[in-house]
Amino acid sequence: MEQEVLVLDGGPLSGPQVVAVARSKCSVDIGPVAIDLMQSAQDVVHAVATSGKATYGINTGFGALSTTRIDHDKLTELQMNILRSHAAGVGEPLDEEIVRGMMVLLAASLCRGMSGSRPEVAQRLAEMLNKGVTPVVPSRGSVGASGDLAPLAHLALVLCGEGEAMYGEQTMAGKDAMGEAGITPISPIEKEGLALINGTHMMASIASLALADIAILCEAAVTSTAMAIDAAKATDTFLDQRLHLARVQSGQQTVA
């Protein structure tokens, strides 16, 4: 897919759009509709955070600590700590294209305005994609069930000026990569840390890239098989349309 700029407007992404950003380095921008959606949602979260009411994920602990109240002046520290505590992946780093796919999928999710994050968060992710800052994300640490928590935590730490990243084909501290690219890291406010890791964007990225590869392989298989049939001067009676209509399999019919 060739597209100069992918504008995230709060709608869903197609597989080819993810691949365009992940592999072809298509630029990403955040549309005005998405900015309004995110700002409206963040206004609600901020109102809850300043109301004095205990609300999970905003001013409480997480999991077993859900009944522990967190003081308002420690909410940024709370959100940073959930990123640091979950950045526990191991193994070889994921390929750059997988991480870039994660980044655009995460940005698109935030742009829906249902996560309560500020527009700046998605805008920084887009800026990282456009300037070539790619977080180093270990390949092991998630099965994509209740969320790719560890991989996304490694990604989000770079967004916040921590962790490790690739920039200019060199691995360096996330803070240095952001600095060299001229990107200002964010300091996550209420709920943003949770919003950054509570998703299955790694699995979705891997699936998008795998589907693109499968489509290419299927086309190659069909073409090479047709050429082999022609070269061998084999019969083509097995391609009779009536046979394949009887099977009611759309893929089989298309190949035939």
Question: What label would you give each PLM region?
Answer:
Residues M1-A256:
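Conserved, well-structured ligand/cofactor-binding cores
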